[in-house]
Amino acid sequence: MKIAKDSVMAETIDVLNIDEIKKLIPHRAPILLIDRVENIIPDTEATGIKAVSCNEPYFVGHFPDFPVMPGVLIVEAIAQTASVMVAATTPDFTAGTLVFFTTIEKARFRQPVRPGDVIE
């Protein structure tokens, strides 16, 4: 889940763990879909990391015999990564403020995300 933009503002942040993420965005289990965010370059890029467990609640019904992470949740994980990048690098950002996508163009899912996968 790499988020990219065009300009660079300030210094990079190497990694934010789950506790630091929770201080920045309001999402909580079961909808908090990133475990950490790495390589945050302000206004430019960030990499969200999610270790997908067999215990994820959405696997119960999607699909019981062939569990696959729903694409809409992958997009949500990308949005959460972007929110963390904005929150962590914007001066005077109010923690817990919601950040929204306005458009997503040409999104493609190259392969199913299954239990045991780690997505970036």
List the predicted regions and their residue ranges.
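Iron-sulfur (Fe-S) cluster-binding modules
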Residues: M1-K2
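Hydrophobic beta-strand-centered segment that forms part of the acyl-chain substrate-binding groove
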Residues: D6, A10-V15, A82-E120
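Short aromatic-glycine motifs in intrinsically disordered, low-complexity regions
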Residues: L16-R28, A95-G96
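Catalytic strand-loop segment that frames the active site of acyl-thioester-processing enzymes
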Residues: R28-M69
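Active-site helix/loop of acyl-thioester processing domains in fatty-acid/polyketide metabolism
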Residues: V37, M69-F93
